[in-house]
Regions:
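C-terminal helix-rich "cap/oligomerization" subdomain common to oxidoreductases
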Residues: 30, 58, 66-68, 115, ...
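A contiguous active-site-proximal alpha/beta segment in oxidoreductase catalytic domains
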Residues: 97-149
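Rossmann-like dinucleotide-binding domain that binds NAD(P)(H)
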Residues: 148-216
Length: 301
């Protein structure tokens, strides 16, 4: 199976390539416009010269079965569009695009061409989060915070807060019928945002504070007098009277802990099986992000 990796930035190098390069039966091709990066990364993963590409045309000429897109978000629409047009099953790091219209167009194109389009919502596959589906979830709280990093609202929401939005959508136990958004925008930069989702018998709250003094990610699900916390995607604390802690094993790879290994293997399995994946549900997370962006822009105006 010929698999291309487009864009060789930090996330591709640290999380995706170690998984892809280890898969038997995968002929890995790399593409980036930066020759020095291409040579260095290819050498690390023993990718021979004929599988190293500095332009998309050269890569597409190889007759790919699947592609992973880790290029900057701004160029996603062009790259993903070309891949889908020629029938290549495509996995794109979130978001599909910064603008909802572009995301909608690409999801429609994938369905028209009957080609898989998968979006990198790895947290759905992270063991600590996936297991929360089995826990009472009358109240869901998720925080993903950073230090000293206010940002343009659209960039922050689509590049980062989208993880919170999608995780809440994944975990809510019923249909969402109420959405509210609060944010603080100073000098055009979003400092914090709070999203509250409600439905029959449940409330889900997502928080991102870019001036929090701490880089952290905390998920809590609770109900029926029990609570589960997942700290930084690693440690799981169950509360029912006394807390019990399950720590990540010392030898568990980060890619597995964060759900990246699992989402990659699930995508490759679908390609091998000829199963077409739809990004329609992922698009719903993008639509909710658009509501968040517009709400905080109005509040900051």
């Amino acid at each position: 199976m010929k698999v291309g990796c487009i864009g060789l930035g930090d996330i591709a190098q640290k999380a995706y390539l170690p998984v892809l390069a280890a898969q038997p039966g995968v002929e890995l091709h790399l593409q980036t416009r930066t020759p020095a990066t291409l040579e260095r990364v290819a050498a690390v993963h023993h990718v021979p010269g004929e599988r190293r590409h500095t332009d998309l045309d050269s890569l597409l000429a190889q007759g790919l079965d699947a592609a992973f897109v880790h290029a900057p978000t701004a160029v996603h629409p062009e790259i993903v569009g070309r891949l889908l047009e020629v029938g290549v099953a495509t996995y794109v790091d979130k978001p599909i695009a910064y603008e909802l219209a572009d995301s909608e167009r690409l999801v429609d194109l994938a369905e028209e061409r009957n080609v898989s389009l998968a979006v990198g919502f790895n947290r759905r596959h992270a063991p600590g989060y996936a297991q929360c589906v089995e826990h009472p979830r009358e109240l869901i709280l998720m925080q993903k915070n950073r230090v000293g990093l206010p940002e343009d609202p659209r960039t922050m929401v689509l590049d980062d807060f989208i993880h919170v939005v999608d995780t809440l959508r994944f975990l809510v136990p019923g249909q969402i019928d109420d959405v509210s958004v609060r944010g603080r925008v100073e000098n055009g930069l979003l400092e914090h945002v709070v999203l509250q989702l409600g439905g029959a018998g449940f409330t889900a709250i997502g928080v991102m504070n870019r001036l929090s003094g701490s880089t952290e990610e905390v998920l809590e699900v609770s109900g029926q007098d029990t609570k589960r916390q997942v700290l930084n995607l690693a440690d799981v604390v169950d509360h029912k009277g006394q807390p019990t802690v399950r720590r990540r094993g010392d030898w568990v790879p980060v890619a597995r802990q964060r759900g990246i290994e699992q989402v990659v293997l699930a995508f490759l399995d679908s390609v091998r099986a000829g199963k077409v994946l739809s990004a329609r549900d992922a698009l719903a997370s993008h639509e909710l992000c658009e509501r968040v962006v517009r709400a905080v822009q109005e509040q900051g105006a």
